[in-house]
Amino acid sequence: MKIGIIGAMEEEVTLLRDKIENRQTISLGGCEIYTGQLNGTEVALLKSGIGKVAAALGATLLLEHCKPDVIINTGSAGGLAPTLKVGDIVVSDEARYHDADVTAFGYEYGQLPGCPAGFKADDKLIAAAEACIAELNLNAVRGLIVSGDAFINGSVGLAKIRHNFPQAIAVEMEATAIAHVCHNFNVPFVVVRAISDVADQQSHLSFDEFLAVAAKQSSLMVESLVQKLAHG
């Protein structure tokens, strides 16, 4: 099994990258892909860059060039579920765009023409992630993760997301674009991220302060999940 891992920022991939053995670096389209073995399992780790276009471009390059069997999206996210705090884990059962609006033509809010309203994560990957969470004794929530090309740190943006997606547990800037590409390639995916902030007016300050905490927690989860998928 070869496992693809995608993070947007240097801080979100560095801990995993440093553990890859026999590492080789591939530079493509402004992205970097690191291949090798993580605890004996073949991995391809992508640093995509921030935002939906960068994530979709990177995911496509990763899938075409490295042919992973599954994709894990890692990194940080803003918490929406009331029980979440910094360092907690969120696992997607679905991903949707929070900034797409073609409702004038009868589509659901967040749905693009020719696409499902949401992109479902793989049940086996979700189950494996939840098993890792239990083994690591981490606090976690599973549910809808929404994505858009905006960092949410104000009441207006937050209120709009809560209105359109009251069930959403977290918000970030890449996951749904990655899920969209995986859907088109028919490759199973799951989003496993750690909370760096709660999406409020102080979220930009919290993000800067706690990004390292979120990166450490999400990397710990991904390393455990890779081991679980490879060896059970």
Swiss-Prot record:
An MF annotation (GO) of this entry: adenosylhomocysteine nucleosidase activity
Result of altering E12 to A/Q: Loss of catalytic activity
Keyword Amino-acid biosynthesis tagged: yes
Effect of loss of the gene: Cells lacking this gene are deficient in biotin synthase (BioB) activity in vivo due to accumulation of 5'-deoxyadenosine.
Annotated control of activity: Strongly inhibited by aryl-substituted MTA analogs, alkyl-substituted MTA analogs, 5'-methylthioformycin, 5'-chloroformycin, S-formycinylhomocysteine, 5'-methylthiotubercidin, S-tubercidinylhomocysteine and S-8-aza-adenosylhomocysteine. Poorly inhibited by 5'-isobutylthioinosine, 5'-n-butylthioinosine, 5'-methylthio-3-deaza-adenosine, 5'-isobutylthio-3-deaza-adenosine, S-n-6-methyl-3-deaza-adenosylhomocysteine, S-adenosylhomocysteine sulphoxide and Sinefungin.
Enzyme class: hydrolase
Phenotype when changing S196A: 2-4% of wild-type catalytic efficiency
Protein task: Catalyzes the irreversible cleavage of the glycosidic bond in both 5'-methylthioadenosine (MTA) and S-adenosylhomocysteine (SAH/AdoHcy) to adenine and the corresponding thioribose, 5'-methylthioribose and S-ribosylhomocysteine, respectively. Also cleaves 5'-deoxyadenosine, a toxic by-product of radical S-adenosylmethionine (SAM) enzymes, into 5-deoxyribose and adenine. Thus, is required for in vivo function of the radical SAM enzymes biotin synthase and lipoic acid synthase, that are inhibited by 5'-deoxyadenosine accumulation.
InterPro entries: MTA_SAH_Nsdase, Nucleoside_phosphorylase_d, Nucleoside_phosphorylase_sf
pH dependence statement: Exhibits activity across a broad pH range. Enzyme activity is moderately improved under acidic conditions.
Assembly with partners or alone: Homodimer.
GO CC term (a single one): cytosol
This enzyme's EC code(s): 3.2.2.9
Reported impact of R193A: 13-28% of wild-type catalytic efficiency
Thermal response of activity: Optimum temperature is 37-45 degrees Celsius. Rapidly inactivated after exposure for 10 minutes at 55 degrees Celsius.
CDD domains, sorted: MTAN (cd09008)
GO biological process, one term: L-methionine salvage from S-adenosylmethionine
Reactions accelerated catalytically: S-adenosyl-L-homocysteine + H2O = S-(5-deoxy-D-ribos-5-yl)-L-homocysteine + adenine; S-methyl-5'-thioadenosine + H2O = 5-(methylsulfanyl)-D-ribose + adenine; 5'-deoxyadenosine + H2O = 5-deoxy-D-ribose + adenine
PANTHER family, A to Z: 5'-METHYLTHIOADENOSINE/S-ADENOSYLHOMOCYSTEINE NUCLEOSIDASE (PTHR46832), 5'-METHYLTHIOADENOSINE_S-ADENOSYLHOMOCYSTEINE NUCLEOSIDASE (PTHR46832:SF1)
Name of this chain's protein: 5'-methylthioadenosine/S-adenosylhomocysteine nucleosidase
